[in-house]
Amino acid sequence: MNLKSLANPSVYFSLTLAILAFGLDRAHKAFQVSAECIAIGAAPCVEVFTSYVPFAMTDWRGGEVVRVTDFFDYVLVWNTGISYGLFDSLPVWSLGVVTAVAILALAIWWVRADSALIRMGLALCIGGALSNALDRLLYGGVADFFHLHWGTWSFYIFNVADVAITAGVILLLADLIGLGRPQKAPV
């Protein structure tokens, strides 16, 4: 990135997206994750939540399912792996290293990107990944809340950061297929 590219509005817009993705997820988790768990710090809050731990500012306790609609439930699940619970048997530090390397690679890609769509997609991915990484560092797992299902079909349980990451990937795929790029005139 050079000084000329700093004048590009997509740089500031994408930074705003990253901050929003991170901030909205942190705010949601601050409202829902117990103050007792936060006070524990690096202790494995995953184990704490298997017993009774009241949530800050609500009567809701993790683990119980709150049916919102016929296809949407609200529940706290601690994901000790990465997406879809993959690699949940690996130690937290190794997942932290993988996450840090991924975030660094995305940041380098963001700096070198010349497309607004790529910058926005990467920013959403980085903001969401940073928030989930902070969960892993603080609690030993990532707090997930939203569960979509229909009949016997069940989607994985996710959080606001996961929504940001998914939206970021969709923007990257849109750029890959050419959306948002100026069309070349036929010769």
Regions found by a protein language model. Name each.
Residues 1-187:
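Alpha-helical transmembrane bundles and membrane-interface segments of multipass inner-membrane proteins
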